Every structure is written in structure tokens, then in C-alpha cells.
């Protein structure tokens, strides 16, 4: 270890060190242009170079040096080289692969010079350089082609070559450490570790390695799907100096994952979060002092050894952090229990206290005839089902073997492992790569991002080959199965087994440096009851060897192929299962940790028939000389039988319960099949029909409510429960009506979507959740005027009123309802909810207009608690007082709140518009001008569906497809996803929901902040004008955008175009939902609305693709996956009126006039410019390659007056439509 490394370790033990902040953020502040990036050397480079930040170490080194020095001056101990994208792979985007080594070397040398200068100034505070290896722009474990999940656009070897070249240059340029950062695909990082270790060996150096991963969203997983602990387990073999997290999230969101890492990591922990989450402009708003306060709390909690900043952070942030952690003790390295720490997408830790681990054996061509056939016939989809079944049946690891004479084992292994990577329900468990061919093993290791197991290596080919393979496995980061096999052959006796294992253990731990907990011995399981006397003690020898290994070889694990022991009884599954059960019973007691088994065919030792168990024990323990003969005689009795014939009986057992328990079970499980039958039975037993509702049905719903409140049931399950409840109540209603009885409820609530708004999915869900908790709901539907809401509330004597809305004009209508409630003397609570609502708006705009309780409810899951408190005699006063005090604080803070960035005049904003050389650009000519009706089938659109918002509708948080394997909601998400696809199948087959739309392309040019739209190419007749708003806050280093900027100015003489569209998931949406409601089926009512919404968004995506490739035709060769479409990785944008880039809703009327939308599609606009049906999307098309989404945000009075003049509206009217965007008080 060098003196510098020793010095660094000493510093880490004494204090929290500080890393630098965002490099890209600082480069942007210089507002460099294309010429700056090129410099003299690259003036004639054949492609654009602006944005190639890493190139600046050659073309503008003074800028990068200034940024390094600014961070050192701010207090940074470590700076990162400007090489995030300097691999040959990433540099290919700029045709600069050949410059990779030069850029890395120059970057390290430049950072080294800055660090040495600052160390010379303050020798007591040495400065260090971390040579950065970025993630590249490729993913080794994710297919870029949605139609071919086995395809990869980069290989492990390709990554290793690129990372080796960069590492060599960074080391030679003077880096003190190598930082592998922003890891979103762990397989890329494993390749980086392999490359760094290999290059260190070639150079004869050993620098500390830092690793930092990226948790991409609230799911708590990397982009490639791993949890924090799985990610750590996968890279633990790097023996990194530090392990940490950076990017994607701000301190609030990242905290829990840093906390988890600090608990599990044996090394030092780093964190460099973003300055919060990006705002609508893609900028970061978290100021330095606020961020530093959060970081100080982390440090005080003992999470940190090194801290810095990522996107959006500046020297001001780093200076504040440096002050915040000064004097605080660094995190102490924890003592972590020794365990074999494996991973798939999720961790699997096998320690001393772990239960037996099942390794699924059926994905093995040598052991499963079915699997072999599927692989040979290339039926990989069915082969995946075999793997999935093993996991579903309890396999915690799956063993994969492709060794078959007529197979290309390498190709089959690679393809199957790549396919598994795209199946989260399989990939969540670790992989055991099983082969007798080293080349196959290596190919497999290059495909798995988790920490897997290699099965196997041995000393049969000599010690040199054994050591060579073991060293490579260590570098790949795999645990290893070591066979009890040496130059003399397989160990068959207990003495030979421990002799070979002892020798292998010594070589691995002392010569190779292999962690003992990653060594898994297979002392050879051989078949018993073969009729050969020498074989009689095979099982007992294995069991005894387990005891020897555990006693003599600390932390080593034991495994074996369990099916081998029963091979003599192949064809007699019940006897084989009994042999396995008895064998495992004794082997596990003696230390066996895991076994390769058929996870779906494991019998339970205590459940075996006594005579069979005793006979098997005689054989396994070799207790009788005639044990084999006796078992053979008995075996025929059990051939073809099943030891667990009770499965079907258990499944139907609940039908034998007493009726009240059956009703509860049906409610909790959402089973409608028997509900009328059981409800009638309960009615026959009750004195009055109402007692069935107030008794067993409400008891069951109380269980549902409790489970939902405790997080043990999820919204889709609750809605299914409500469906059962409604059908039971509907059955009882005629009997109740005949007896003139009314049930007792917890309260009555009128709910409605306000006038002008047609969106009701969220409202419907709230209604269902409250009904499940015995509240009576009077649902008035959508577009309900204030007068009707209040009249109904009086008529039904409501206890509460709930208002919902999605579009921004609904906010004003909610204020109007509150004013009317006050005027009419209401005192009952008013609840506010919906996508555009907020606590701030409720406090500032609504509550002050109504003296009764006014409460903002964020989501359905919180509604029950709020309603219960408001109607409680004991809780109400306190809850209302606390809420009013909270809202008063919100109003005070709102009044004091200053804009994050100061406003500028409209004139100044226009002077800072999007600067573009229109003379050097020719806009693409639209191929098909005019208006066209468009239809698309559900089967076409389902390929374009973004499912993540669908799950959000049902309050299931997580990103698709990873949500399907989520530890908490995964099972329910899978059920919901199946139900959704079943309904799509039905809607498609029956054609009961028919998406339709209209699109138009028109000649157009910009005039100021407006876009003139022309009748034809003569451009002499203006048929309409699209009016737009400009960003009006100070934008240092950025333009003040307006959508009109992306269309060629009229004065430029360039012919440009604009597109418009309107699509709906189907006019039949409401009728279908009403039909389900009539059947008391809230679940399918909400489902059809949610799917119609998804189909509308999918239609918009599909139509935009058609416009780019065909109608406008500026991207005819575009070939994007659905994920890439969702991420909008294409040229052009389709902003929608009412959304951040064009927030004013009345502009939809321009689209309706241009396209004659109602005539072509039947879609309508309400008085508030909401679209009907609710599942509808409309917007504009822009083709400009630099067009982008942004948020207009707050505008000032001068722009409002200008906009009113341009639109021919009064200022007051414009202020009403743009109320959320006003940067001044309009009252």
C-alpha cells in the first residue's frame, strides 16, 4: 500500500471527506458555443461537438481547471476527472473513439496539477484525484430492442476493452483513485471492475477503487432492476475502498438508500446526490444551505465517510456541505456477519442462521428431458416458463446447464441468460452457471449482473488450472462450487471427501485469496440402493463429510445434486421424493447448506408414510444389510401414487366453513362466485335481512379496511372486495325494501367532479375505498355544477362534500363551490382532491372562502383517516384546529415566498429567446398536408402502452415492469396486470371500445410569440393563429423559451410547418363504465376507465410516430422500442394545451377548429375546455431537432396584457385561465 493510500485511509478514519460537485452544471454556466468546443484543433471535425464536455480538457482546458480550482477552494478533498463520457464507447457519438486515451490522460493530468497546487498551499489538507469511469451509453444487461429481449448492443468484452484503455490513461495521467460512478447497469460496472483489476495487474500498480451506483426512482432500484443490497452484493468482490450512491435523486429521496448502504457495507460509504429533483425546466432548485442542512443530518446519523454533489450542485453547495460536516465524526466501519452474499435483482445472503437453500434443477439439459427438448427446438419462451415455475415453487437459486452434445452450449447459455435478464420474476434470484466446459462458464459470467455461483471447478486437471480458474472467478465476482475431485478421481469415501476439500480450501484461501464464505463444497452425492454393496454407505459418507467440512473449514458452504441419491428409483417419483426428504433431513442436520433439487417436488419428512420413511432411513443410514431389498419390495406399493393428494381438498376447504367465515373469506379474497348463495344462507339464519349487512358483511369489510390500512392489501384488491360487497347488498336490497329497514352507516358523503371537468377515475376510487369502510357515497358523476352539488347535499342530509378535478380551470370552480357553501350557510366539511389540487392551493384559495372545515386529501389511501377524524365526536375539534393552524402556516409561507429565480420583463425574455441559425437550416417538408381521420385497433395500441401510470392509478407505486416483482406490491401488480390484459383482449375481440382520432399538418411560420397557420403553400391566407407564452424568469445560461421559437420566423423566408392532433381511447368509455356500475362492479368500472386513458396516451404515442415516419416523414428510418418512445428518444415534441409548455386551455379551441375535431371523432370540449371523453389527448406537433419540453412557469402582468391583446380577450379573463401561472396577485 502506497503512502498516499495510507494517508487517505487515515484521513477517512479521522473525518468526513468532501468530494466535488457537478461538472456539467458548471460547464453550462460558461455558456460555451460550438466554436468553444471545437477550438482550433477540431475546427473542421465532421460532426457537431457542442455537448461533448469531456473534449474541453483538450479544447478549453482553462475552463475545466477553473472548475476544479473552484471546488478545491470550496473545500473539496477529492476532485473527479472530467472523463464521465471518455470511453471509446461513449466517444463514438462524436466519432472520437481514437481520442479516448488522450482525453483521459489529459483530464487526469489537468486534475493532478490542480490538486498538487492546492496540496502545496495547504499541506495539512492533501488533495486527491479520482479518475472517473462513467457508465457509457450502453447497457450490457438490458436489450435496446423491445422485440428481441436477448439482443445486446454491447458485450462484456467490449466494455472491458474500453474501460482498460481509459483506466491505463487515467493512471498514467496521475489519478490517485479510480471512481466507477453513476452505475445504472451493474453488469457494466462488473466489466469495469474486471478491466480495472486486469489493467492494474498489467501496469504493476494497485490504486483504491471507488464505486457509486444510481437508484433511478422511488422503486429503490437501479435502472437494471437491482435493489441497493443486491447491487452491493454484486460488486463486493471489487474490495472497493468506498461504495456509494449518486445522481438521479436529491437528498430527501436518496436518504433511505444511503442509510441502507451504510448498514451493509464493510467499506467506507460515499454519497453525492443531486441538488433535489429537476424542475419542469430540467433545472435543480435545491439551494446550498438547505442541501447542506440535510447532509449534516446524514452525517450526524452516522451514514457518511465521503460526501459531495452531483447534478445541479455548484461550488456554493460544496462549500456549504464542507462547513456542515466539519467536526462531525465519520461513519465507523461496521462488523458485518460472515455470509455468502449472492444476488439476482434481489439479495440472497446465506449465513450460519440461514435455512436450507433450494437450487432449482429443472433448467438443466442433462437432467430434464423437457428442458433439453425446448432448448434444442429453440422454444425459449417455454424454457423460461420452466425457470419461472422453479422460482414460483420456491427455488432461491436456479441452476442452468446447457452441456449437450448436439447444442452450441455457449450460444444457448448466452441467449437463455439474456432472456432471463428481461424476466424480473426469474431474474430476482441468483443464477448458478453449471457446466463442465470453462468457455461456457465464462460466457455465462459475462451475462449476469448479479453475483452468481459457478458449478463447478475441481483439481482433476491439476492445481495450476484450478488456481487459474479460481482467480478468474474471483475477478468476475462469483461464488464457486468446488467438487471433491482431484487428480486421482472423485472422492467416494468420507475420508477422501474431507481430504480433497481440505486441500482445495487451503489453496483457495491462502494462494488465491478467495473468501471462504464464497466457497461451496460438493462432496459428491452418489446413488444408493443400486444392489452393489460398495455403494451402500454413499449417503452416510456424504452426511459424515458435511460434519467434517463444517468442523474443519470455517465459513465454507456445502451443496450437492440431491436427485443423484435416488437415481436407482427413476420412474417412481413418490419413492424418489421420500429418499430426497430423508437424505436432506440428515444432511441438513449435519451442515448441508443448499442442494440442487426440483423445487416443486420436495416432500416433507414428517409427512411421509411411516413404513416408507423407515425403509428409506434404513438405506440412507445403511442400518440394515437387507435395506435395499426391503425398499425395492415396498417401492411398488407407492409407484404412481401421490404423497400429497390433499391439494385440491385444501384449496376448497374454505367452502366447508360456517357461512359468516365464508362471507369474510369471499370479501377479503374478492371472490364473487358464491356470494349470492352464501348471502342467502346468511339471510336464512338472520332475524332480519339488514343484519347480514351489519353483521358478517361489515365484519368482513372491517377486515378489508384493517388490512388496507396496515398496507397488507392494495387498492385493486380493495376494489374487488367492494365488488363482492355491492353484489351481496344488491341481492339483499329487495328483502330490505320489503321490510322497510335501513342499515346504519358511518356517515354520508356527496362526491363530484366539478363543472367543466370530465375526469373521474380518482373520484371513483375514493368512493370505493370509503364504501369499503361503511360510508354511504352519493356520487354525482362529472361536470357537476355547484348548484347541483349543494342541492343534493341538502336533500340527502350529507355529512361531507368531496370535490375532484384534473384540469387547472377546475381549481377556480372549487373556489366557487366553497363560496357558495359559505353563502348558503353550510358548515359540513369540504374535502378537496385531484391531480391539479394541492395543499397550498386549498389553503390559499379555497379555505379562506369557507368557514367550515376544508381539507386537502392527497390520495385515496388517506381519505378514510381524514373522514373518520372529521366525523368523530372526540377527534373532530382537534383535527380541524390542527389543519387550520397548518393551513395558516402554509399561507404565511406562501406570502413570504420569493420566486426561485427573479422575473424579467417580457422584452428581456424575448431578447433571450431560443437562438438558432435559421439560414443554415431547412425545415423538413410535410409529406401529407391537410386533415385526416385516423383509427387504430386496440391490438396495435397495446404495444405502445406506458403501464407505469396505470399502476399509479391504482395506488401501486413502482415503475413497470419492475413493479411486477416488487417485494411489497408485486403479487397484486401481477394480478392487476393480468386483469387489464384480459379486459383489453375482450374489448378488442368484441370491438366495444374503439379508439379514434384526427391529425392535420399545415404550412406555418412564427410571428413574434404566435404561429400563423396557412391554408396552403402559398402562405397568403391565414386560417388560424396559435398563441403561445414565453418563460419569464431569469435564465442565466439558458434561453427563455416559447413554443413559437421552434417554428421558422416569417421574416426568415423559410417554409415551415406545424401539426395538430386529437385522439380518444373511445367514445364508448362512459357507457361501458356505466354498464359495470349497473352490475355493482366498481372494479371493472375503474378498470375500463383506466385502460381507456392508457389507450388514449398510447394512441398519441403511436400517431406521433406515424407523423414522424410517414405523414410529416422527417424520420422515416426511426426504429425505437416502446421504452425509448416512453422516454421520448426521438426528434420533435407534441406539447398539449393545459400542460407546462402551453398552460392556457382555451388554445384547444384552435385545434378543434383546425381539425374539425367533433365532426371527425365525436370528441367535444366542455365550457372549461376539458376534453370529452375523459380518455382523450390533443396537442401540437413540432419537428425542430432542438425542440424540447419545458415549463412556462410564472409570468408577469406585462405578458398577460400582451397575450390578452393578441387573443382578443380581456386581461381579467386571461388571468382567470392562467391563474396558476401568475407571478403576481391578480386580486
UniProtKB/Swiss-Prot annotation:
Domain AdoMet activation, chain residue ranges per copy: 897-1227
Residues annotated as domain B12-binding N-terminal: 650-744
Effect on the protein upon substituting residue 757 to E: Decreases activity by about 70%
Cofactor: how bound: Binds 1 zinc ion per subunit.
Keywords: Amino-acid biosynthesis, Cobalamin, Cobalt, Metal-binding, Methionine biosynthesis, Methyltransferase, Repeat, S-adenosyl-L-methionine, Transferase, Zinc
Residues noted as binding methylcob(III)alamin in the record, renumbered to the chain: 694, 756-760, 804, 808, 860
EC annotation from Swiss-Prot or TrEMBL: 2.1.1.13
SMART domains linked to this entry: B12-binding_2
GO BP term, example: tetrahydrofolate metabolic process
Enzyme class label: transferase
Binding site for S-adenosyl-L-methionine: 946, 1134, 1189-1190
Domain B12-binding: 746-881
Catalysed reaction, written as an equation: (6S)-5-methyl-5,6,7,8-tetrahydrofolate + L-homocysteine = (6S)-5,6,7,8-tetrahydrofolate + L-methionine
Known pathway: Amino-acid biosynthesis; L-methionine biosynthesis via de novo pathway; L-methionine from L-homocysteine (MetH route): step 1/1
Effect listed in the UniProt record for changing residue 757 to N: Decreases activity by about 45%
UniProt remark on domains: Modular enzyme with four functionally distinct domains. The isolated Hcy-binding domain catalyzes methyl transfer from free methylcobalamin to homocysteine. The Hcy-binding domain in association with the pterin-binding domain catalyzes the methylation of cob(I)alamin by methyltetrahydrofolate and the methylation of homocysteine. The B12-binding domain binds the cofactor. The AdoMet activation domain binds S-adenosyl-L-methionine. Under aerobic conditions cob(I)alamin can be converted to inactive cob(II)alamin.
UniProt family annotation: Belongs to the vitamin-B12 dependent methionine synthase family.
Protein name from the UniProt record: Methionine synthase
Originating organism: Escherichia coli (strain K12)
Gene responsible for this protein: metH
Amino acid at each position: 500500500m502506497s503512502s498516499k493510500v495510507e494517508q487517505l485511509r487515515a484521513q477517512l478514519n479521522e473525518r468526513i471527506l468532501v468530494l466535488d460537485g457537478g461538472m456539467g452544471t458548471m460547464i453550462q454556466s460558461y455558456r460555451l458555443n460550438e466554436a468553444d468546443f471545437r477550438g482550433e484543433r477540431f475546427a473542421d471535425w465532421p460532426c457537431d461537438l457542442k455537448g461533448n464536455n469531456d473534449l474541453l480538457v483538450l479544447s478549453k482546458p482553462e475552463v475545466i481547471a477553473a472548475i476544479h480550482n473552484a471546488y478545491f477552494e470550496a473545500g473539496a478533498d477529492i476532485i473527479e476527472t472530467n472523463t464521465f463520457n471518455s470511453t471509446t464507447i461513449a466517444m463514438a457519438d462524436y466519432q472520437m473513439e481514437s481520442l479516448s486515451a488522450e482525453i483521459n490522460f489529459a483530464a487526469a493530468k489537468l486534475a493532478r496539477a490542480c490538486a498538487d497546487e492546492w496540496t502545496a498551499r495547504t499541506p495539512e489538507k492533501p488533495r486527491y484525484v479520482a479518475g472517473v469511469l462513467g457508465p457509457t451509453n450502453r447497457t450490457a444487461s438490458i436489450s435496446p430492442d423491445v422485440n428481441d429481449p436477448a439482443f445486446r448492443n454491447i458485450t462484456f468484452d467490449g466494455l472491458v476493452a474500453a474501460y482498460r484503455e481509459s483506466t491505463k490513461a487515467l493512471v498514467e495521467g496521475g489519478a490517485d483513485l479510480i471512481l466507477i460512478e453513476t452505475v445504472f447497469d451493474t453488469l457494466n460496472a462488473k466489466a469495469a471492475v474486471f478491466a480495472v483489476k486486469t489493467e492494474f495487474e498489467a501496469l504493476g500498480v494497485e490504486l483504491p477503487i471507488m464505486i457509486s451506483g444510481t437508484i433511478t426512482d422511488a422503486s429503490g432500484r437501479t435502472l437494471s432492476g437491482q435493489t441497493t443490497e443486491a447491487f452491493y452484493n454484486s460488486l463486493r468482490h471489487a474490495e472497493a475502498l468506498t461504495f456509494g450512491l449518486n445522481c438521479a435523486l436529491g437528498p430527501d429521496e436518496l436518504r433511505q438508500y444511503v442509510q441502507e448502504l451504510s448498514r451493509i457495507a464493510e467499506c467506507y460509504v460515499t454519497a453525492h446526490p443531486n441538488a433535489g429533483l429537476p424542475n419542469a425546466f430540467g433545472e435543480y432548485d435545491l439551494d446550498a444551505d438547505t442541501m447542506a442542512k440535510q447532509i449534516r443530518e446524514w452525517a450526524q446519523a452516522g451514514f457518511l465517510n465521503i460526501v459531495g454533489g452531483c447534478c445541479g450542485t455548484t461550488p456554493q453547495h460544496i462549500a456549504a456541505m464542507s462547513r456542515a460536516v466539519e467536526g462531525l465524526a465519520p461513519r465507523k466501519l461496521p462488523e458485518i456477519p460472515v455470509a455468502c452474499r449472492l444476488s439476482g435483482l434481489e439479495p440472497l445472503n446465506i449465513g450460519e442462521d440461514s435455512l436450507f437453500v433450494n437450487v432449482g434443477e429443472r433448467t438443466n439439459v442433462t437432467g430434464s428431458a423437457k428442458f433439453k427438448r425446448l432448448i434444442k427446438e429453440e422454444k425459449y419462451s417455454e424454457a423460461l416458463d420452466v425457470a419461472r415455475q422453479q422460482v414460483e415453487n420456491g427455488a432461491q437459486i436456479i441452476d442452468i446447464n446447457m452441456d449437450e452434445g448436439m447444442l452450441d452450449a455457449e450460444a444457448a447459455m448466452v441467449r437463455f441468460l439474456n432472456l432471463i435478464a428481461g424476466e424480473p420474476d426469474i431474474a430476482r434470484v441468483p443464477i448458478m452457471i453449471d457446466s463442465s466446459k470453462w468457455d461456457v462458464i465464462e460466457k455465462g459470467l459475462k451475462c449476469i449482473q448479479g453475483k452468481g455461483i459457478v458449478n463447478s471447478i475441481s483439481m482433476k486437471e491439476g492445481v495450476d488450472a484450478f488456481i487459474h480458474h479460481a482467480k478468474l472467478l474471483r475477478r468476475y465476482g462469483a461464488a464457486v462450487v468446488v467438487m471433491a475431485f482431484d487428480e486421482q478421481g472423485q472422492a467416494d469415501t468420507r475420508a477422501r471427501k474431507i481430504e480433497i476439500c481440505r486441500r482445495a480450501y487451503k489453496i483457495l484461501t491462502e494462494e488465491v485469496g478467495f473468501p471462504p464464505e464464497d466457497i461451496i463444497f460438493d462432496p459428491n452425492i452418489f446413488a444408493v440402493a443400486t444392489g452393489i454393496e460398495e455403494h451402500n454407505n454413499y449417503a452416510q459418507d456424504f452426511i459424515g463429510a458435511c460434519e467434517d467440512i463444517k468442523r474443519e473449514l470455517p465459513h465454507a458452504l456445502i451443496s450437492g445434486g440431491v436427485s443423484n441419491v435416488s437415481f436407482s428409483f427413476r420412474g417412481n417419483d413418490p419413492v424418489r421424493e421420500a429418499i430426497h426428504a430423508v437424505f436432506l433431513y440428515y444432511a441438513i442436520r449435519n451442515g448441508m447448506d443448499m442442494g440442487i433439487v426440483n423445487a416443486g417436488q420436495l416432500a416433507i419428512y414428517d409427512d411421509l408414510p411411516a413404513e416408507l420413511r423407515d425403509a428409506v432411513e434404513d438405506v440412507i443410514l445403511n442400518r440394515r444389510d437387507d435395506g435395499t431389498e426391503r425398499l425395492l419390495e415396498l417401492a411398488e406399493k407407492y409407484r404412481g401414487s401421490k404423497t400429497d393428494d390433499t391439494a385440491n381438498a385444501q384449496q376448497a376447504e374454505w367452502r366447508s366453513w360456517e357461512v359468516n367465515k365464508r362471507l369474510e373469506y369471499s370479501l377479503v379474497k374478492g371472490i364473487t362466485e358464491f356470494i349470492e348463495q352464501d348471502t342467502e344462507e346468511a339471510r336464512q339464519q338472520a332475524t332480519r335481512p339488514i343484519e347480514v349487512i351489519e353483521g358478517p358483511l361489515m365484519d368482513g369489510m372491517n377486515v378489508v379496511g384493517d388490512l388496507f390500512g396496515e398496507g397488507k392489501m392494495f387498492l385493486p384488491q380493495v376494489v374487488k372486495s367492494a365488488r363482492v360487497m355491492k353484489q351481496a347488498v344488491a341481492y339483499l336490497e329487495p328483502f330490505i325494501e320489503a321490510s322497510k329497514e335501513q342499515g346504519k352507516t358511518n356517515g354520508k358523503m356527496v362526491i363530484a367532479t366539478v363543472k367543466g371537468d370530465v375526469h373521474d377515475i380518482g373520484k371513483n376510487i375514493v368512493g370505493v375505498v370509503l364504501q369499503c369502510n361503511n360510508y354511504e357515497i352519493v356520487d354525482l358523476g362529472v361536470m357537476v355544477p355547484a348548484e347541483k352539488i349543494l342541492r343534493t347535499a341538502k336533500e340527502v342530509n350529507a355529512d361531507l362534500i368531496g370535490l375532484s378535478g384534473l384540469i387547472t380551470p377546475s381549481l377556480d370552480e372549487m373556489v366557487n363551490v366553497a363560496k357558495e357553501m359559505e353563502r348558503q350557510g353550510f358548515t359540513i366539511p369540504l374535502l378537496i382532491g385531484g391531480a391539479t389540487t394541492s395543499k397550498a392551493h386549498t389553503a390559499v384559495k379555497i379555505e379562506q372562502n369557507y368557514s367550515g372545515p376544508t381539507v386537502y386529501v392527497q390520495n385515496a389511501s388517506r381519505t378514510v383517516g381524514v373522514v373518520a377524524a372529521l366525523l368523530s365526536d372526540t377527534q373532530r375539534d382537534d383535527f380541524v384546529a390542527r389543519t387550520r393552524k397548518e393551513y395558516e402556516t402554509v399561507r404565511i409561507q406562501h406570502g413570504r415566498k420569493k420566486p426561485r429565480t427573479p422575473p424579467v420583463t417580457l422584452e428581456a425574455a424575448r431578447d433571450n429567446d431560443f437562438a438558432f441559425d435559421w439560414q443554415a437550416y431547412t425545415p423538413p417538408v410535410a409529406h401529407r398536408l391537410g386533415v385526416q381521420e385516423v383509427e387504430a385497433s386496440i391490438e396495435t395500441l397495446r404495444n405502445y402502452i406506458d403501464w407505469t401510470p396505470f399502476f399509479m392509478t391504482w395506488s401501486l407505486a413502482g415503475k413497470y415492469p419492475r413493479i411486477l416483482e416488487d417485494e411489497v406490491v408485486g403479487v397484486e401488480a401481477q394480478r392487476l396486470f393480468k386483469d387489464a390484459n384480459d379486459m383489453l383482449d375482450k374489448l378488442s375481440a368484441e370491438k366495444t371500445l374503439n379508439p379514434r382520432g384526427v391529425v392535420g399538418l399545415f404550412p406555418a411560420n412564427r410571428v413574434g410569440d404566435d404561429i400563423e397557420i396557412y391554408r396552403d403553400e402559398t402562405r397568403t391566407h391565414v386560417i388560424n393563429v396559435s398563441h403561445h407564452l414565453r418563460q419569464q424568469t431569469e435564465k442565466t445560461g439558458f434561453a427563455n423559451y416559447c413554443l413559437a421559437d421552434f417554428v421558422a420566423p416569417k421574416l426568415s423566408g423559410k417554409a415551415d410547418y406545424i401539426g395538430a392532433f386529437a385522439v380518444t381511447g373511445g367514445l364508448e368509455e362512459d357507457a361501458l363504465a356505466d354498464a359495470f356500475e349497473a352490475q355493482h362492479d366498481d372494479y371493472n368500472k375503474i378498470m375500463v376507465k383506466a385502460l381507456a386513458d392508457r389507450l388514449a396516451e398510447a394512441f398519441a404515442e403511436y400517431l406521433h410516430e406515424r407523423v414522424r415516419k410517414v405523414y410529416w416523414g422527417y424520420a422515416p428510418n426511426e426504429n425505437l422500442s416502446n421504452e425509448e418512445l416512453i422516454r421520448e428518444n426521438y426528434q420533435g415534441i407534441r406539447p398539449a394545451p393545459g400542460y407546462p409548455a402551453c398552460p392556457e386551455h382555451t388554445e384547444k379551441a384552435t385545434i378543434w377548429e383546425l381539425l374539425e375535431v367533433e365532426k371527425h371523432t365525436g370528441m367535444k370540449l366542455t365550457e372549461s375546455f376539458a376534453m370529452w371523453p375523459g380518455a382523450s389527448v390533443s396537442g401540437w406537433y413540432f419537428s425542430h431537432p432542438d425542440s424540447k419540453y419545458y415549463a412556462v412557469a410564472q409570468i408577469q402582468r406585462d405578458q398577460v396584457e400582451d397575450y390578452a391583446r393578441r387573443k382578443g380577450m380581456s386581461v381579467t379573463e386571461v388571468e382567470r385561465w392562467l391563474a396558476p401561472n401568475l407571478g403576481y396577485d391578480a386580486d
